[in-house]
Amino acid sequence: MNLFCVGLSHHTANVETRERFAGGAGARSILRQAGCAEALVLATCNRVEVYGASEKRVSTDQIAHCLLQNNEVSDRGHSEALPFYRYEAEKCVQHLFRVASGLDSMVVGETEILGQAKKAYQSARTSGAVGPCLHRLFNGLFVLPNRSARIQKSPAVLCRSARSRSTWLKKFSASSGIAAFWF
């Protein structure tokens, strides 16, 4: 399974460009149009990202086309000029964790993004667009804030949490067919 993220953010596109894509691209339509086995759309005021998993590689242009088509914007000649970024496999996982923790936000440390990721996950899950790969990835993401709160209370928890996270990463890598990664 190929895990990937394709998106636009405040780092790569101005507000007007981001708004063209934020209007409601649904994960189900991306599944149908681009051939993804799983898809989730995370749209915030500063980013629009598609997290997906597929048997064969889905191109960045295919995702851009789906986003443009779903937002009823003419896509002739636009996808080549748009500043999309793409992360695959472990880079995708690292990017998601940076985004959700607020490290990739316009205001570093922003906490709202994790809630937006949870809503995007619930929406995609309800529509049937989340499968086992994205389910494990996002559920692994959602346990981190609870662990962080416990770490602040006791230094011993830090060691257990690091060991637990290391074990989770190894299991996720092995079961997803993704090479081991660390961040």
Where are these regions (language model features)?
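Conserved class I S-adenosyl-L-methionine
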Residues: A179-F183
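Glycine/serine-rich phosphate-binding loop and adjoining beta1-alpha1 elements at the start
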Residues: S79-I178
